[in-house]
Amino acid sequence: MQPTNPNQFTEKAWEAIVRTTDVAKQAQHQQIESEHLFLALLQEPGLALNILKKAGLEAAQLQQFTERFIARQPKVSGGNQSVYLGRSLDQLLDQADQFRKDFGDEFISVEHLILSFPRDSRFGRLLSQEFKVDEKQLRQIIQQIRGSQKVTDQNPEGKYEALEKYGRDLTEMARRGKLDPVIGRDDEIRRTIQILSRRTKNNPVLIGEPGVGKTAIAEGLAQRIINGDVPQSLKDRRLIALDMGALIAGAKFRGEFEERLKAVLKEVTDSEGIIILFIDEIHTVVGAGAVQGSMDAGNLLKPMLARGELRCIGATTLDEYRQYIEKDAALERRFQQVFVDQPTVEDTISILRGLKERYEVHHGVRISDNALVAAAVLSTRYISDRFLPDKAIDLVDESAARLKMEITSKPEELDEIDRKILQLEMERLSLQKESDLASQERLQRLEKELADLKEEQRSLSSQWQAEKDVITDIQSVKEEIDQVNLLIQQAERDYDLNKAAELKYGKLTELQRKLNEMEGGLATTHTSGKSLLREEVTEVDIAEIISKWTGIPVSKLVESEMQKLLNLDEELHQRVIGQEEAVSAVADAIQRSRAGLSDPKRPIASFIFLGPTGVGKTELAKALAAYLFDTEDAMIRIDMSEYMEKHAVSRLIGAPPGYVGYDEGGQLTEAVRRRPYSVILFDEIEKAHPDVFNVMLQILDDGRVTDSRGRTVDFKNTILILTSNIGSQYILDVAGDDSRYEEMRSRVTEALRANFRPEFLNRVDETIIFHSLRKDQLQQIVRIQLHRLEERLSDRKLSLSMSPEAIDFLVEIGFDPVYGARPLKRVIQRELETAIAKAILRGQFSDGDTIQVAVENERLVFKAIATPTAVPLS
């Protein structure tokens, strides 16, 4: 038979024949023989290698044998490089064609070629003798792989063992102990088993939010099947998870995807109920593989699902179920819904306790029970956009990974010594070049110090290595215990009770004793205070990871921070002058929050700041942001003058569907989603349209708002500050007259009620009235402003000295009770900053000078005083 017609062969078989030419040319052979074809088949992973592997043959050994055989054949060098079909290959192809007819196939496939080799009188005979391969064995393997399928197209290899290619056997993974234990979820698993036991429409679909444990329910069912903890109708069944991505990937031509899916479904139906399919993200089935004029996967599944021929478990989220499956009513009625709710905090703690051992073995650290409780409780409170138990498991996992990283990194004490040694060695090199007596004495002292440090370094290094080795040994023992427990379970399943008892009371007991000894030794090192490494995850680690994720300071208060919090009002007073009531109210709110006593279902605090312009309303918000986040930029500032139209509310929470900017989200909601812990300043609220405040009712009361895309944005860790100038004329009327304070307060409150609705005002924690500023307070503000100017001057190596008269002069011309401190800022800019700038440009001041400012003839005068250069100490 001449292999000139590719239409007689499948794609893979023809590719192998084409490669045969290259193999022969590389070996400098003029005739293509059967050995060249065999080597070409070995070089391409696929069906040929799979058949030979199942026959117990190693690909590497086969390749070596074939290459040695080819190397022994006579070579032809020079002349024409064309190759001809050899007699052995011609006969082999004829034999393959005969096998094709025997099998009832339409094309010569790879399996026909492989099956022909034992009948090859040239290379095949030697191969059979060397590796004990016979035709009968190969035929059985091919029948097993092909099942009842015939070669009816040119790509049949893609349809063989389709489930093995495109699925994962969950029951096999459960048998090998590869699945995590599933704790709880008994009701959902029971309902799934109940639906699977039906005669028709026996297809449960698990519906729930992402991360609540839908896939875990399928894994739990696989574990129950292995343990025999299922009804008779599910005994010895195989649960296979279908990988839709692998099924679609690489399907280049129309109809190729459908062929693959049909092959999978055929294997499932041929198993006569033994195989149960699990399709994670089942919504991907709807529309999968659909191109013009071809069917999608959902339509291929429908007939089998309805008749009960195919038992399938699906899993998808609520949104995707609504979006894809509910639209297809015919597909929806074939599935029975099983709702999977988010577990409670208590259930999550139980789940974490069940998984704890797996994570301890993986990371090689211990996880305290307090850490598990903290992960469940804190993730519920602070991570609102994800679901339990997923977010709590992630916290424990990342905390353990972080601690493992610390164990393998160099301890701080050792790192410090290493740096010091490096520094001293550099100093020693420098001193060795000096010959004077002082340098020689210093060198001797340095040598002694270096020797002591190196000794300490050796001691600490060996201690660190020893501790690291103990922790690694503990991990190895835990892994061994894990393996022994798995063997015990397998022995109990097989009713091999002698083996189970031998392992449980022999090997397992010995390993447990060994583990207890090692952990006891490590605990003694820790309690003695000599330990360099920490190997237990605590609640502090969990809190630190939450802080990293969200920016919310959840970690326990250390002594220095407690002191800082107690002095918070004093710190704020240094920046905001003359507003004791406002500063105290804000400081109290922060102290309540950090002590953990604020209401977890509302924002940390919400204030309305009322007062005339320039008295420190916005400045207090900036000071607070600077204290909490070390930068004023962390404040989310919303200028309400931009929200004067009714429709502008969409800018806060996002444009509704169908409008331009829908995908961008809202200015407020997106900022808070990215930074859940922040100070939000709504400046000049009286300028905004009244309807804008309807959005704020939920924020102030429940600490949450739903944006235009239906996502709940959490405001529970924010401080809301709203500023307004309403009633400022009444505040100015009583400036400095404390006896009329109550009268002024009631008039300001009336003005506020006239402008805002009661349901809005009633939700704000506190309305604070800022007083107009007095002259003596302006003096303090001048000093603050001058301090900032001094910081800017220090960049030019200049310092500033102001006489008391100069400060009084600035206050006098900058004082205006109506406009507050802002005119003062302009006066400093005009009278002081501009004059200094001009003097610098004229060259009046040089580096290191002190600028002395005094008053003469009702104007500021400047004098340069040279600062003496510092004499270095010998």
Swiss-Prot record:
Annotated GO biological processes are: cellular response to heat; protein refolding
Subcellular location per UniProt equals:
Cytoplasm
Chain positions covered by the region annotation NBD2:
561-772
Q: Where is this region: NBD1?
A: 161-342
| SMART domains recorded | AAA (SM00382), ClpB_D2-small (SM01086)
Annotated spans, Repeat 2: 85-148
Positions of ATP 2 binding: 611-618
Q: How does this polypeptide assemble, per the annotation?
A: Homohexamer. The oligomerization is ATP-dependent.
The entry sums up its family as follows: Belongs to the ClpA/ClpB family.
Q: What is known of its domains?
A: The Clp repeat (R) domain probably functions as a substrate-discriminating domain, recruiting aggregated proteins to the ClpB hexamer and/or stabilizing bound proteins. The NBD2 domain is responsible for oligomerization, whereas the NBD1 domain stabilizes the hexamer probably in an ATP-dependent manner. The movement of the coiled-coil domain is essential for ClpB ability to rescue proteins from an aggregated state, probably by pulling apart large aggregated proteins, which are bound between the coiled-coils motifs of adjacent ClpB subunits in the functional hexamer.
Per its record, how is this protein called by name? Answer: Chaperone protein ClpB 1
Q: Which organism is it from?
A: Synechococcus elongatus (strain ATCC 33912 / PCC 7942 / FACHB-805) (Anacystis nidulans R2)
* Gene giving rise to this polypeptide: clpB1
